[in-house]
A protein has these predicted regions:
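Internal amphipathic helical hairpin motif
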Residues: 63-121
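Glycine-rich phosphate-binding/hydrolytic loop that grips phosphoryl groups
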Residues: 151, 194, 270, 289-366
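Glycine-rich phosphate-binding loops at beta-strand->alpha-helix junctions
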Residues: 259-286
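Small-residue (GG/TT-enriched) beta-loop-alpha framework at ligand/catalytic clefts
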Residues: 3-18, 34, 52-53, 114-220, ...
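N-terminal phosphate-binding loop and adjacent alpha-helix
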Residues: 25-51
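Short glycine-rich phosphate-binding loop at a beta-alpha junction
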Residues: 52-65, 143-146, 251, 255-269
Length: 407
């Protein structure tokens, strides 16, 4: 049984969800939203309230940059990696970026427009921002640092025969294009829920109240406006921003050669009632739905809408439980974490990973200080021994060479 605490951080809001995985079953142990002013204090509070002191944590990065590179599908893996590095360095020169200040990752997909090429989704983040995240979670089991636009598909129930957009309206809006069930493209918009909340907050002087106002607001399509019984004083803040977002989504759809069958809406703005119908009208009838985590069903205790509010955090928790893209983690693990992974790996021969196969298992508490001391001591002792043997071999080789020369 493994658990992961997903924490999604925006400028004023933190969303969190702790997910436990047992075999193929997923369970939400705890979730919630907090408006914060002191980030470190709020993180400590969430870890304490969810009893996640020993659980791994998965968080988002912000303001990451996306670039798209197109390569021949005939390149070897080694040549492809070199070509991607060279292309990105050229982009940095063109855009006047310092490549040494950036940490980058990439994913490879088939180019839908040219079958002889592959498309590289290249993601770069400022190293200073990554280091700040590491500092914010110092002393905690931070496992994953991942772009939210690439983790949000983790919770979608995708259809191999459909192409979809996931419009995640958090502080800023990300648009993730899925071809079948695979990520194909990401577009970030400058407009998002932050504009709505900031404008309401300026009037109410409470970010929490601004969020609650959005939850209690219903917007209507042109046909349903007559059903609105009273004027909502806050629609003037909400509707214009949603209109801007919807039109930019429409532009993305129009510019793509891929036919979009469905649009999923999620994020902070998804708490606004009827937002899916509003978008569907503006997107000329393309089916729009609120994104629901694939493994969660309505219950008498908790309404599924409560889970939907923390979709971003749930997707991050799933990322920490090894769902989604495996090579998008911006967290560089230290030596101890790598050793723990190695010691905890399934090395059973003759069975699939994760299967019990009736064999005995050894349970080692890798967080024990004594175990750490023992492992690290023997680890470095082994390195020292190998180094001594290597030097001895070199001395013997030189001695043997001189002996042959004298003879």
């Amino acid at each position: 049984m493994a658990s992961c605490l997903g924490i999604y951080i925006d400028s004023n809001i933190i969303k969190y969800a702790k997910i436990t995985k047992e075999k193929d079953d997923l369970k939400v142990d705890a979730f919630g939203i907090k408006i914060y002013s002191d980030l470190l204090q709020t993180i400590d509070q969430i870890v304490s309230e969810t009893f996640s002191f020993k659980d791994q944590i998965s968080v988002n990065i912000t303001d990451e940059m996306y670039d798209y590179l197109y390569m021949s599908d005939l390149l070897s893996k080694k040549d492809l990696a070199k070509a991607i590095e060279t292309e990105f360095e050229s982009l940095c020169v063109e855009k006047q970026y310092n490549p040494n200040a950036l940490e980058s990752r990439y994913a490879i997909v088939n180019d839908q427009n040219d079958k002889t090429k592959i498309k590289v989704i290249h993601v770069a983040e400022n190293k200073m921002k990554i280091n700040q995240i590491l500092q914010n979670f110092d002393g905690k089991r931070l496992q994953n640092i991942t772009p939210i636009a690439l983790t949000i598909p983790n919770i979608a129930q995708t259809n191999e025969k459909e192409n979809a957009l996931i419009v995640n309206i958090e502080d800023k809006t990300s648009i993730t294009t899925l071809v079948g069930s695979k990520i194909y493209d990401v577009q970030n918009l400058d407009v998002g829920a932050q504009q709505i909340l900031d404008e309401i907050n300026a009037k109410e002087n409470s970010y929490l109240k601004a969020y609650e106002i959005c939850k209690n607001t219903t917007i209507y399509t042109m046909e349903g406006q007559g059903l609105q019984q009273q004027e909502n004083d806050y629609l003037g803040y909400i509707v214009p921003n949603l209109f801007t977002i919807a039109n930019q989504v429409k532009d993305v759809i129009g510019a793509s050669l891929i036919k979009i069958n469905k649009v999923y809406i999620t994020g902070t703005a998804s708490v606004i009632n009827n937002i899916d119908l509003y978008f569907e009208e503006l997107l000329d009838g393309i089916k729009c739905e609120i994104l629901k985590p694939f493994f969660i069903e309505d219950s008498q205790k908790i309404n599924i809408k409560d889970y939907i509010e923390v979709n971003s955090a749930i997707s991050l928790a799933l990322q920490g439980l090894e769902y989604g893209l495996a090579n998008m983690n911006f967290n560089k693990k230290n030596t101890w974490e790598q050793l723990k992974e190695t010691l905890g790996s399934d090395i059973t021969i003759g069975g699939k990973k994760g299967k019990d196969n009736g064999k005995k298992k050894i349970n080692i508490n890798l967080n024990s200080p004594k175990v750490k001391q023992w492992v690290m001591r023997d680890f470095f002792r082994s390195i020292s021994t190998i180094s001594c043997l290597w030097r001895a071999c070199n001395v013997y080789r030189l001695w043997n060479a001189r002996k042959r020369k004298r003879n």
